[in-house]
Amino acid sequence: LFDDTVYKNITIGRPGASLDEVVDAAKAADAHAFITAMPQGYETALGERGVKLSGGQRQRLAIARAIIKKPKILLLDEATSNLDTGSEQSVQAAIERILGGRTVIMVAHRLSTVKNADKIFVLKKGGLAETGTHEELLKLGGVYKGLYEAQT
């Protein structure tokens, strides 16, 4: 995040977006409630001289930024890493809401993040080990199943 307002942090990829568009993106990213609880809402300063955000709040602002940009391809790299369970669930719900109508590439060690993906590619030692849906990979009984069972 940048040392600027919440509004400007969300619109960095699409300057000039209306407040209504920013609010819609924040709602889809499950960020609107914590933003409106801040002293100046969307005009609250963030960063060194402003409000400090939790990891989950930062992730949800990043998701709002992606939503407002409306990319055809979205890359999410460890979107739920280092989050507590509540924040992880909130970020996962936000991700689920923005998946439709675009190609999303997710890099994740937490398999719960990719469980609903159309296709999962499992890498091991720098190579492709398995590919399939969550259900197909569990039935296969290989690397993915072992990792999934270790995490649940």
Where are these regions (language model features)?
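Short beta-loop-alpha junction of Rossmann-like oxidoreductase domains
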Residues: F34
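ABC ATPase nucleotide-binding domains
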Residues: E149-T152
